Amino acid sequence: LVFCEMYAGGKYDPPGENYEFSLGLNGLGSCATQYASRYMDVTVCRDGNEYKLHFQRGEIVGQMEVTPLTRKKTGTTIRWLPDLEVFTDIDIPLDYYRDVMKRQAVVNAGVTFRLRSEVSAGRFDTQDFLYENGIRDYIAELAGEDPITEPVCWEAERQGRDRADKPEYKVKLNIAWCFSNRVHLMEHYHNSSFLEHGGSPDKATRLAFVAALDKY
């Protein structure tokens, strides 16, 4: 269903606890990618079985294959090839993928993201991105060896609502910062998505920081 029907994601299903802080999951990405691919192979391991699906140019080929697993295994593997009849410009710089994967590693602490780039037939360059302590390690990396202050990390989780007539939702916050006379940078992420222009979180952070200093 996720690969064949638009808006089939479970992000907004009540209570939605599995997806409260997730990027995407509206039911668009997987389906749109499948329709825009020359082929897509999906393998899902769960509940003691391995499930396989094969698509070609937006159509499922054959039936779903179900194979019992002999050992406990979970996870999903998706392989696809963009359809050149859909994507006419595929000259995407490798640095773009490096940047995206590094940022995902920053906000998904302890998860390794591996980039494999084919430099010649059968030969790959591999680069891993891993931040065991998430944004804390990222701030320490940016600040270098001689920051004015050591990195500080705050975490909090709250419940609230935008208006009295709106349902409550959870907010989970992670903030890491330090003072440095060499690096001047502020970055913001929402549900693991990098906010290039900062948006509301940037304004809120600046106002709160100045207010706290004034109060002190």
Regions found by a protein language model. Give the residues of each.
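GHKL/Histidine-kinase-like ATPase module
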Residues: 95, 102-104, 110-216
